[in-house]
């Protein structure tokens, strides 16, 4: 016959600090692209808002764009660069 010694189960939760959850109010961020704006390589006033001072494409998190909008914006910026509407790099002078 097998003998097992049952140990009393300890509660380790008493050593842990209680978790405090700070609920932040949910803010709805407005999209920087309005409903009338078309993401197009010819729309330079729109494209220039999503490029850094060095000429880099800003990330979607910085831009507050959806992934689909960011993808369309990236393609429009690249197309504008190829057609020489935008420089690939900005001079630092």
UniProtKB/Swiss-Prot annotation:
GO biological process: translation
Principal subcellular localisation of the protein: plastid
Keywords: Chloroplast, Plastid, Ribonucleoprotein, Ribosomal protein, RNA-binding, rRNA-binding
Listed SUPFAM superfamilies: Ribosomal protein S18
PROSITE patterns assigned to the protein according to its UniProt record, in alphabetical order: RIBOSOMAL_S18
Cellular component per GO, a single term: chloroplast
Pfam families: Ribosomal_S18
InterPro entries cross-referenced by the UniProt entry: Ribosomal_bS18, Ribosomal_bS18_CS, Ribosomal_bS18_sf
Known partners and oligomeric status: Part of the 30S ribosomal subunit.
Name recorded for this polypeptide: Small ribosomal subunit protein bS18c
Organism: Pinus koraiensis (Korean pine)
